């Protein structure tokens, strides 16, 4: 910022210094008088006519302020006792405030505070303003950059200085009314130049600055607000749209609080700071107390304290209410004591009865469980044997399953390998087809190469001939030219000799010679014409010869090409016929393959179904054999007893239980599963049963279970209400005789029938437990256990349908059926194998056929290309021939022209025949006159003329021939070049195809090798599958034999389970009776040491020695004692309720008391913390205020005092001032300047306590005199390095001390600005 001599306007934002170097010239100041309280202090500067510079006065003030600060020995003592000589104010801090200040404020605290402020971290400052169409600023105007410490805004009245402050206020969220406008749209600039603008905006650029006034890199922050014509506005932060709350929070984090706006002191507002009331009169107002609390930070406690006070008040009300409710419930409890005692006596008697019943039930249970143990041991033995069979059966099943999985895995592997084979075949076929295609292409290219080679050789020979001819022409031409030169020389010599002879005969022949010359002159045009015609004729004759030769060549080419085309067409037709037959064969093969594939799928399904039927029938056969064996065993017992009954030796025998009733076939599985006792034998009494047992034992016929009708308890057999109205299994039976109903009910009880397992679960596990069986044989017991289901279900239990069906004849029939199915299975398997072989054979033939077809297609395609090529060649030749023949007009014209030339020459000769004759006659005369010598010489000359003409004609013909050969050579060269290029391309293509063919052959060989590997692997897998299938068939037969043994054991186990079930039912009965016994819990009303709350446990010895008859007698006595008494049991519950209610209400009351105590502590702590923090800050601010006021006024005094010393927050804070050499006065009684100084002293004191990085002041020095302006300006410059001051001032004492001046001026009703660095100038 040291650019010199550069003037900056608002359009050039760089900062410049328009002053020369400080040592260049002195600076004159106007005459001024500095008034002060002591003339002695400023005697050296009074009435200075010619001062060296303003800095002298500034230095004086700086020294005065520094001395004042250094002279104070102790701020706290000075504050308390006014040791500076000024009278102490009796209405100042009273005893309480003095105590608080001394308690919370010490000199060390203040010094520490000062020391802390010396460590200046980076702070946020306003760098510059960018105003666009804002109020008086038209267009975009940049105001600034501002100095990080002290900047002054100067300019004439009305130029727009305050609009700078308005711009800041606008961005800081002030309404238009605060900016001296009625609405936001009024802020948009309007002038003659810019009468109608749509918007205006102000952008503030902030930067962070270090203590040495260097800016922090990357710290730039821009905040912009834009107002529109429709009175709306938007905020932007760093160019991104934002909101006022976001802007406010962002700046608050940087230290600029937009809510309290302490940093803004607007025009006319400086005096109002010190004139604030001690505290706010109403909510929303601000008093001095609130002003200080916001700065100190204790205002945050106010809403919290108020909220807690409200809660404390509410808690007092709740405590009173809860105490009243507690007393009410205690009174109600006392009224129930007598009724409670009566009920307790009755319940104790009932508990004694339940004790006796519990002991009786436990004794019976002990006996039942001993019996259950014996049955269980036998059952465990049978189940152990069954388990061994099951393990063997399951092991076999696992082996079969594992082998099946192996077969499945191998078949999947075989399928994968088969797919790989197919894929390899297709890949190999694809490569073979590509090979054939390339071989055909190679064959075609080799033929083409051969033809091209012949054509190149022929053309090369013709070109060589033409070039040789041209070469010999040059030699011959040279010879002829040499000969012409010799002849011309000789002719010249001979003519000279002839002229000499003529000259010698001139006298004799002059007349004749003249006549000859005249006639020769007359004949010269004709001779010239003849020579011209002869030359033209020779040219036309050459052209005519060329046309005739080309036509003959084309005719020969057409005939040759037509012959080749006919041969190619015959070859193509032959290949097409072969291809057609091959395609038909391929189509037939594919059709047959498709049919065979379908037949294979059908046959596979047939084989699968046949195998499934075979295995099913085998299983059925084994089950029938096992069932027949079991039926025979069971039938022997029943049949023997039946014969005994028929012989009248066994009265009361009724037969098998399942034969004494019938049921619908739909419920066959359900009854067979739910009632294992259907095979039990029914007798009338124990005696009959004992006879049956003795008979079976004596005859060694086996065992049987019996149901004794007379021993069955009488039950209510009427229909019952069931869940979801499902039927009860007992109700579905049709009895042979109603007397058998109790027997069936005894084994079935209330077993229900559900349609499916889902319905069974709903019913069985409902509120009431039920025994439920499904139609498919799944049984859910009351205990929750589930049995039955699976692949093999029980059926035929109600009748002997299955037993009667399983006869030896039916077993034999089933065996024959199994053998028949086995034969069919093997036959279908053989047919499937044949189909697979045929499918494989067809699959192998198809690729070969496709390969042959591919070759034929390539041959046909090649022939078609050759035919098309020959046809195009013939068409082109015929087109050329036609073009030549169409050019006959030219040929006729040439012939006519040559003929006309001949005629014209002949006519000329005829016309000049007389002259020729005359000339010859005259020449003959000269010959006669000249004699022999002349004739000889004349003959020589004529002979030389003839020779020269002959040689020249020969030379001309050679020139024509040379031209023709040159044309032919060029034509041959072009054609040879094309043929050579085509030959090279063909050769390259052949090499490429050979490489491709070699690579493809390699691929084909590789895929053939892989195909062989896959085929070998497939054969190995199929062999393994065959071995596994044989193993599975053998194991399946073994498993069927194990099934028969298992069925016999299951029947024995079922009998023992039935017996165990009966014992279990009896056990459950007494367990249920025991579970219904519940002792009344009286421990909460009686002494726990004398009152049992649970039943006692008994040892086996105690149970075995119990006298059941005595117990029954005692139980009877207790029942009579309790049956006749009537008591209201509900009294206990009511007493219990009252007691619990009393405890609950007492607990609530104590809890609320504790809550109230806690709230009181919270409120006390908050109030104490608020007071402590406020008084600490208040003491520091008071000290600083006193110090600031003394510095600013040079001897005055100011105090902040509490209106109520006991409670600073009740009446607020007073601001009292004692101007220099005056008494203590209230702020309202001060002059304008004194009010301003007081406010500024408070502002500076608050800044010292809690610095704000930015202050914006608008003409705060308006009411101050020259001296006070200088004091304030010096203080701002020297003592506020940690803040940025932007001051609008018209007082030179103020703005001359600023570090930077921002000048505001207006032209054409549009404000502009200029910024300069304000540097001091030293005088000589």
Swiss-Prot record:
One GO location term (cellular component): chromatin
GO biological process, one term: cell division
Amino acids binding ATP: 155-162
Sample GO molecular function, one term: ATP binding
Phosphothreonine found at: 19
Annotated ranges, domain SMC hinge: 651-764
Keyword tags: ATP-binding, Cell cycle, Cell division, Chromosome, Coiled coil, Cytoplasm, DNA condensation, Mitosis, Nucleotide-binding, Nucleus, Phosphoprotein
PTM description: Phosphorylated by CDC2 on Thr-19 at metaphase.
Chief localization: nucleus
UniProt superkingdom: Eukaryota
Coiled-coil ranges per UniProt: 310-337, 370-628, 825-1077, 1297-1324
Chain segments carrying region Disordered: 1-24
InterPro entries associated with the record: P-loop_NTPase (IPR027417), RecF/RecN/SMC_N (IPR003395), SMC (IPR024704), SMC_hinge (IPR010935), SMC_hinge_sf (IPR036277)
Protein's cellular compartments: Nucleus; Cytoplasm; Chromosome
Gene3D superfamilies per record: 1.20.1060.20, 1.20.5.170, 3.30.70.1620, P-loop containing nucleotide triphosphate hydrolases
Subunit text: Forms a heterodimer with cut14/smc2. Component of the condensin complex, which contains the smc2 and smc4 heterodimer, and three non smc subunits that probably regulate the complex: cnd1, cnd2 and cnd3. Interacts with C1739.07.
UniProt function note: Central component of the condensin complex, a complex required for conversion of interphase chromatin into mitotic-like condense chromosomes. The condensin complex probably introduces positive supercoils into relaxed DNA in the presence of type I topoisomerases and converts nicked DNA into positive knotted forms in the presence of type II topoisomerases.
Domains (record comment): The flexible SMC hinge domain, which separates the large intramolecular coiled coil regions, allows the heterodimerization with cut14, forming a V-shaped heterodimer.
Family: Belongs to the SMC family. SMC4 subfamily.
Protein name: Structural maintenance of chromosomes protein 4
């Amino acid at each position: 910022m040291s650019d010199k001599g550069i003037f900056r306007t608002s359009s050039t934002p760089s900062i410049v210094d328009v002053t020369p170097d400080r040592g260049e010239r002195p600076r004159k100041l106007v005459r001024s008088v500095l008034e002060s309280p002591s003339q002695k202090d400023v005697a050296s500067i009074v009435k200075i006519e010619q001062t060296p510079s303003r800095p002298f006065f500034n230095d004086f003030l700086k020294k005065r302020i520094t001395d004042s600060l250094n002279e104070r020995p102790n701020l706290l003592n000075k504050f308390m006792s006014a040791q500076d000589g000024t009278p102490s104010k009796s209405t100042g801090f009273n005893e309480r405030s003095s105590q608080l200040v001394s308690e919370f404020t010490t000199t060390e605290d203040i010094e520490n505070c000062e020391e802390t402020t010396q460590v200046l971290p980076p702070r946020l400052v306003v760098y510059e303003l960018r105003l666009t169409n804002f109020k008086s600023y038209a267009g975009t105007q940049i105001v600034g950059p501002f100095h990080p410490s002290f900047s002054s805004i100067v300019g004439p009245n009305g130029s727009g200085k305050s609009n700078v402050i308005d711009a800041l206020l606008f961005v800081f969220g002030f309404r238009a009314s605060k900016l001296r406008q009625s609405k936001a749209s009024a802020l948009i600039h309007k002038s003659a130049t810019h009468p109608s603008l749509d918007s205006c905006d102000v952008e503030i650029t902030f930067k962070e600055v270090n203590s040495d006034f260097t800016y922090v890199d990357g710290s730039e922050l821009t905040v912009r607000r834009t107002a529109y014509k429709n009175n709306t506005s938007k905020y932007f932060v760093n160019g991104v749209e934002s909101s006022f709350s976001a802007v406010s929070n962002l700046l608050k984090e940087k230290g600029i609080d937009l809510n309290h706006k302490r940093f803004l002191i607007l025009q006319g507002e400086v005096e109002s700071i010190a004139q604030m009331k001690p505290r706010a009169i109403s909510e929303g107002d601000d008093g001095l107390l609130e002003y200080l609390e916001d700065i100190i930070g204790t205002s945050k406690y106010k809403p919290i304290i108020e909220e807690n006070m409200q809660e404390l008040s509410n808690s007092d009300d709740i405590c009173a209410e809860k105490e009243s409710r507690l007393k009410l419930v205690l009174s109600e409890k006392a009224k129930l004591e007598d009724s409670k005692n009566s009920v307790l006596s009755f319940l104790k008697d009932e508990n004694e009865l339940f004790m006796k019943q519990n002991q009786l039930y436990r004794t019976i249970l002990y006996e039942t469980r001993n019996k259950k143990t014996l049955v269980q041991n036998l059952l465990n033995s049978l189940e152990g044997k069954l388990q061994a069979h099951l393990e063997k059966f399951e092991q076999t099943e696992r082996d079969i399953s594992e082998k099946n999985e192996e077969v499945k895995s191998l078949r999947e592997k075989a399928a994968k390998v088969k797919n790989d084979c197919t894929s390899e075949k297709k890949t190999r076929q694809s490569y073979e087809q590509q090979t054939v295609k390339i071989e055909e292409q190679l064959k075609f290219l080799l033929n083409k190469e051969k033809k091209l080679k012949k054509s190149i050789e022929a053309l090369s020979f013709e070109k060589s001939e033409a070039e040789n001819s041209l070469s010999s022409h040059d030699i011959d031409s040279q010879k002829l030219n040499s000969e012409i030169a010799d002849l011309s020389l000789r002719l010249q010599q001979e003519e000279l000799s002839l002229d000499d002879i003529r000259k010698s005969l001139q006298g004799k022949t002059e007349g004749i010679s003249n006549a000859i010359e005249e006639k020769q002159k007359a004949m010269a045009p004709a001779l010239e014409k003849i020579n011209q015609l002869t030359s033209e004729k020779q040219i036309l004759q050459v052209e005519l010869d060329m046309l005739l030769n080309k036509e003959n060549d084309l005719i020969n080419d057409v005939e040759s090409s037509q012959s080749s085309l006919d041969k190619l067409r015959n070859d193509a037709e032959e290949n097409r016929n072969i291809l057609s037959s091959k395609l038909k064969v391929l189509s037939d093969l594919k059709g047959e393959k498709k049919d065979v594939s379908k037949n294979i799928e059908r046959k596979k399904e047939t084989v699968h179904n046949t195998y499934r039927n075979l295995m099913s029938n085998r299983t059925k056969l084994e089950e029938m054999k096992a069932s027949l064996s079991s039926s025979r065993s069971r039938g022997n017992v029943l049949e023997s007893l039946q014969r005994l009954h028929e012989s009248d030796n066994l009265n009361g025998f009724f037969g098998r239980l399942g034969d004494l009733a019938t049921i619908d076939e739909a419920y066959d599985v359900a009854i067979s599963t739910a009632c294992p006792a259907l095979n039990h034998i029914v007798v009338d009494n124990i005696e009959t049963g004992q006879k049956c047992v003795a008979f079976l034992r004596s005859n060694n016929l086996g065992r049987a279970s019996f149901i004794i009708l007379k021993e069955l308890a009488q039950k209510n057999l009427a229909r019952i209400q069931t869940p979801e109205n499902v039927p009860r299994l007992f109700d579905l039976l049709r009895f042979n005789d109603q007397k058998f109903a109790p027997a069936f009910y005894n084994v079935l009880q209330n077993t229900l029938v559900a349609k499916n397992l889902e319905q069974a679960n709903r019913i069985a596990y409902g509120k009431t437990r039920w025994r439920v069986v499904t139609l498919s044989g799944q049984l859910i017991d009351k205990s929750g256990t589930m049995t039955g289901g699976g692949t093999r279900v029980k059926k035929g239990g109600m009748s002997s349908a299955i037993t009667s069906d399983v006869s030896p004849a039916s077993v034999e029939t089933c065996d024959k059926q199994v053998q028949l199915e086995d034969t069919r299975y093997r036959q279908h398997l053989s047919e499937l194998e044949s189909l697979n072989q045929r499918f494989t054979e067809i699959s192998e033939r198809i690729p070969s056929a496709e390969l042959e077809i591919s070759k034929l297609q390539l041959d046909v395609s090649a022939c078609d290309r050759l035919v098309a090529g020959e046809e195009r060649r013939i068409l082109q030749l015929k087109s050329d021939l036609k073009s030549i023949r169409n050019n006959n007009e030219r040929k006729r014209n040439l012939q006519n022209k040559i003929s006309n030339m001949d005629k014209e020459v002949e006519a000329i000769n005829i016309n000049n025949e007389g002259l020729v004759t005359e000339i010859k006659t005259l020449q003959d005369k000269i010959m006669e006159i000249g004699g022999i010598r002349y004739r000889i010489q004349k003959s020589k000359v004529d002979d030389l003329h003839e020779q020269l003409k002959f040689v020249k004609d020969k030379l001309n013909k050679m020139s024509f021939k040379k031209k023709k050969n040159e044309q032919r050579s060029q034509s041959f060269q072009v054609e040879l070049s094309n043929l050579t290029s085509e030959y090279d391309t063909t050769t390259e293509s052949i090499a490429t195809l050979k490489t491709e063919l070699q690579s493809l052959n390699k691929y084909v060989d590789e895929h053939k090798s892989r195909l062989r590997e896959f085929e070998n692997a497939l054969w190995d897998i199929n062999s393994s599958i065959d071995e596994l299938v044989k193993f599975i068939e053998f194991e399946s037969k073994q498993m069927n034999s194990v099934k028969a043994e298992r069925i016999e054991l299951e029947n024995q186990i079922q009998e023992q389970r039935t017996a165990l079930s009966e014992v279990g039912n009896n056990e459950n009965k007494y367990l249920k009776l025991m579970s219904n016994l519940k002792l009344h819990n009286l421990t909460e009303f009686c002494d726990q040491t004398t009152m049992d709350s649970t039943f006692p446990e008994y040892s086996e010895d105690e149970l075995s020695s119990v006298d059941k008859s005595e117990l029954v007698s005692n139980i009877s006595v207790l029942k009579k004692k309790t049956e006749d008494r009537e008591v209201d049991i509900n009294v206990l519950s009511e007493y219990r309720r009252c007691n619990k209610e009393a405890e609950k209400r007492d607990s609530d009351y104590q809890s609320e008391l504790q809550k109230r105590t806690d709230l009181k502590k919270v409120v006390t702590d908050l109030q104490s913390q608020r007071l402590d923090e406020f008084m600490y800050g208040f003491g520091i601010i008071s000290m600083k205020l006193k110090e600031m006021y003394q510095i600013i006024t040079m001897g005055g005094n100011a105090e902040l005092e509490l209106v109520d010393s006991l409670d600073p927050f009740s009446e607020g804070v007073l601001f009292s001032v004692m101007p220099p050499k005056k008494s203590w006065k209230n702020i309202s009684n001060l002059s304008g300047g004194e009010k301003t100084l007081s406010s500024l002293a408070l502002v500076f004191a608050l800044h010292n306590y809690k610095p704000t990085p930015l202050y914006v002041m608008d003409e705060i020095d308006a009411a101050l005199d020259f001296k006070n302006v200088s004091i304030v300006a010096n203080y701002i410059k020297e003592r506020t390095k940690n803040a940025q001051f932007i001051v609008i001032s018209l007082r030179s004492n103020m703005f001359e001390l600023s570090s930077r001046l921002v000048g505001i001026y207006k032209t054409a009703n549009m404000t502009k600005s200029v910024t300069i660095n304000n540097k001091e100038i030293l005088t000589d």
